[in-house]
From Swiss-Prot:
Pfam families: His_Phos_1. Residues 279-291 have a biased composition (Acidic residues). GO terms for biological process: carbohydrate metabolic process. It comes from the Eukaryota. Residues 275-316 are annotated as: Disordered. InterPro entries: His_Pase_superF_clade-1, His_PPase_superfam, PG/BPGM_mutase_AS, PGM-Related. PROSITE patterns: PG_MUTASE. Phosphoglycerate mutase-like protein lacking PGM activity. May play a role in carbohydrates metabolism. This is Phosphoglycerate mutase-like protein AT74. Expressed in roots, leaves, stems, flowers and siliques. Signal peptide: none annotated. Induction: By sucrose.
Length: 316
C-alpha cells in the first residue's frame, strides 16, 4: 500500500492504569518490585469503568458500526490487569489484536525504593528539572522519551504497511494502556512539545483517558474530544490549546508558522520579515540608481571624446 493510501486509525487513546498499591501507599515499592505492584480493589473498579467509557466513545458514531480496537499494553502487572478489566467491555470480534510493548513501560526509578531516600531524591529532581533528572540506578524522563520515540517509529511502520487494519471498511482505534509519565512523554513526542512545556504538564489520574482523534484534514488533535477547560487542567498553555484547535481542522503536512516553540523561542531577535524585505528593496533601488548614474556618465564622456576638435572655428 502506498503512503498516500494508508489507512489511519480514527483514534489513538492513552489510558493510565487504575489505582495501584503503590499509589495508595508508596511503602509498597520498598518490598515489591515496581513491575509487580498490583491494582487495588478500587483500581480494578476504575479499570472496568474505563472500559465502559472507552466502549461508549468508540461505538458512538452510528455511521461507523464496523469499528475495531487494537491494544498496546505495558508489561507491568498493574497495566496488564487494567487491560484485562477494560476488555470486559468488548466482544472478541471487536478486538483485532493485543501487543505487550516494553517500550511503553513505567519510568524506572531504580530497583527497590527506600521511602525516605526517594523523598529526598524527588526534591533534588524538582531542583534539577523533571525531564533531565536521572534517578540513581534508574531513568530520566529523557530516557523514556527515547524509547517512546522508538515505539512511535514502529507504530508508524505498522500504519504505513497496513499491518493492523484487517478490513479497510473497519474504523480502527488504538488504545495504549500505560503509565502517567509515559503518556505525557508520548504526547510530548507526538505534538513536538518542548521540555519546558512538558514540565508544565500534570499527571493523568488513575484510569484517566486522553483521546487523540483524527481531524477532517488528516491530523490528530486532543481538542476534538476534550474541551479547552480539560486541556487547561492537564497543564496545556493557551498557545498549546490553540495549536490543538488548529490541528483539529488542519490538513496533514501544513506548517503552523505562529507556534512560538517552532520559531520564536529561538529567533525572536530577528527583524520582522516585512521590514527586512523593505530594507532589501531600498538597497536594491539605490544600487540600481548608482549603476544607472555610472552608465550615464560613461555615455556622456564617450560623446565628448568623439566630437572633432576645432581650431579657429574650423575642423582640423
Amino acid at each position: 500500500m502506498s503512503p498516500d493510501n494508508k489507512l489511519l486509525p480514527k483514534r489513538i487513546i492513552l489510558v493510565r492504569h487504575g489505582e495501584s498499591e503503590g499509589n495508595l501507599d508508596t511503602a509498597a515499592y520498598t518490598t515489591t518490585p515496581d513491575h509487580k505492584i498490583q491494582l487495588t480493589d478500587s483500581g480494578l473498579l476504575q479499570a472496568q469503568e474505563a472500559g465502559a467509557r472507552l466502549h461508549a466513545l468508540i461505538s458512538s458514531n452510528p455511521s461507523s458500526p464496523e469499528w475495531r480496537v487494537y491494544f498496546y499494553v505495558s508489561p507491568y502487572d498493574r497495566t496488564r490487569s487494567t487491560l484485562r478489566e477494560i476488555g470486559r467491555s468488548f466482544s472478541r470480534r471487536r478486538v483485532i489484536g493485543v501487543r505487550e510493548e516494553c517500550r511503553i513501560r513505567e519510568q524506572d526509578f531504580g530497583n527497590f525504593q527506600v521511602k525516605e531516600r526517594m523523598r529526598a531524591t524527588k526534591k533534588v529532581r524538582e531542583r534539577f528539572g523533571r525531564f533531565f533528572y536521572r534517578f540513581p540506578e534508574g531513568e530520566s524522563a529523557a530516557d523514556v522519551f527515547d524509547r517512546v520515540s522508538s515505539f512511535l517509529e514502529s507504530l508508524w511502520r505498522d500504519i504505513d504497511m497496513n499491518r493492523l487494519h484487517i478490513n479497510p471498511s473497519h474504523e480502527l482505534n488504538f488504545v495504549i494502556v500505560s503509565h502517567g509519565l509515559t503518556s505525557r512523554v508520548f504526547l510530548m513526542k507526538w505534538f513536538k512539545w518542548s521540555v519546558e512545556q512538558f514540565e508544565g504538564l500534570n499527571n493523568p489520574g488513575n484510569s484517566e483517558i486522553r483521546v487523540m482523534e483524527l481531524g477532517q484534514g488528516g491530523d490528530y488533535s486532543l481538542a476534538i474530544h476534550h474541551t479547552e477547560e480539560e486541556l487547561a487542567t492537564w497543564g496545556l498553555s493557551p498557545e498549546m490549546i490553540a495549536d490543538q484547535k488548529w490541528r483539529a481542522n488542519a490538513h496533514k503536512g501544513e506548517w503552523k508558522e505562529d507556534c512560538k516553540w517552532y520559531f520564536g523561542d529561538f529567533f525572536d531577535h530577528m527583524a520582522d520579515s516585512d521590514k527586512e524585505c523593505e530594507t532589501e528593496a531600498t538597497e536594491d533601488r539605490e544600487e540600481e540608481e548608482e549603476e544607472e548614474g555610472k552608465r550615464v556618465n560613461l555615455l556622456t564622456s564617450s560623446e565628448y571624446s568623439n566630437e572633432p576638435e576645432l581650431y579657429n572655428g574650423q575642423c582640423c
